[in-house]
């Protein structure tokens, strides 16, 4: 890991000769910028920034709910406040909308630009939230997880013998777990699945560097189960393997408890992938498969539940089966921003 001083030198070099940095260099530049900002901030600026983070999220969620970013994204030109008020769905009072737009234009949000008095234009950052794939994350965390985040201080300061299983239970009394609530709210479930698909597309995938076919022996028949993606959501990993096994024998199975959209089911069928409703805490109905695959499942569950899931996998395996776990592992020190997910787990899933 590069030192902060090295990253700052890298930033100076970049400012002198801007280019198109690769992935690692880009992350180092962002970290260097953040270090510089942190070193320049006055205490009152730090306090104000943190105090308004919740409002930032609420304003962005309001704009998403009004379809404001989609309205701005139709054409790359300035729009008047009155024009946008008519274009939002539902239509918004132009005075309230003007206040919302002014907030979205402030630093560090910069999600719109005020080109002149009462006229607004999209930015590249704001256009991100015109896309369903990206706006789903903001919507899900605000609507579903936000109350659990708000309950975290109360939960964590409660004595051990009085503390409920998770902050989610403080925020949603009597509603069980986060995943149980998803099953009972179709709109939230669709938003969650859309966000999971988006995250999956932008995260490291083991299949990019490992050929899963290594664990599938030659001589398999059409009836043999060669790959079971347990808790596989809408099936992106099963589909990725399906592309590599076109014309080869064997059944590829996608398992999950949560229902998926008709479009996702049709996508699986078009790739000859079977979909089975399955709770990974129950006995695995598919015995002796070549590969049982778990991608980013275990960080959502406490240790005891992870052991239960693994026991079910072990009981279904034979000597020729392989267990593949694709998971996020955090170092004790110097953790990446993915550490945020750890506290997301504490708040919503009690991991």
From Swiss-Prot:
| UniProt keyword annotations, A-Z | Methyltransferase, S-adenosyl-L-methionine, Transferase
Mutant lacking the gene: phenotype? Leads to the loss of apicidin F production.
> What does its record list under induction?
Expression is positively regulated by the apicidin F cluster-specific transcription factor apf2 that binds to the eight-base-pair motif 5'-TGACGTGA-3' called the 'Api-box' that is found in all promoters of the apicidin F cluster except in the promoter region of apf2 itself.
- Pfam families given for it? Dimerisation (PF08100), Methyltransf_2 (PF00891)
Q: What is its EC number?
A: 2.1.1.-
* Gene Ontology molecular function: O-methyltransferase activity; protein dimerization activity
* GO terms under biological process: methylation; secondary metabolite biosynthetic process
Used how in biotechnology?
Apicidin F, like the other known apicidins, is a cyclic tetrapeptides with anti-malarial properties via histone deacetylase inhibitory activity.
Metabolic or biological pathway, per its Swiss-Prot or TrEMBL entry: Secondary metabolite biosynthesis
Q: Where does S-adenosyl-L-methionine bind?
A: 231-232, 279-280, 295
Q: Which InterPro entries match?
A: COMT-like (IPR016461), O_MeTrfase_dom (IPR001077), Plant_O-MeTrfase_dimerisation (IPR012967), SAM-dependent_MTases_sf (IPR029063), WH-like_DNA-bd_sf (IPR036388), WH_DNA-bd_sf (IPR036390)
**Which EC class heads this enzyme's classification?**
transferase
- From which domain of life does this come? Eukaryota
Query: Which residues are responsible for catalysis?
Result: 299
Q: What does this protein do?
A: O-methyltransferase; part of the gene cluster that mediates the biosynthesis of the cyclic tetrapeptide apicidin F (APF). The non-ribosomal peptide synthetase apf1 incorporates four different amino acids to produce apicidin F: L-phenylalanine, D-pipecolic acid (D-pip), N-methoxy-L-tryptophan and L-2-aminooctanedioic acid. L-Phenylalanine is the only proteinogenic amino acid directly used by apf1. The 3 other apf1 substrates are non-proteinogenic and have to be modified by other enzymes of the cluster.
Q: Which family does it belong to?
A: Belongs to the class I-like SAM-binding methyltransferase superfamily. Cation-independent O-methyltransferase family.
**What's the protein called, per UniProt?**
O-methyltransferase apf6
Which species does this protein come from? Answer: Gibberella fujikuroi (strain CBS 195.34 / IMI 58289 / NRRL A-6831)
What gene is behind this protein? apf6
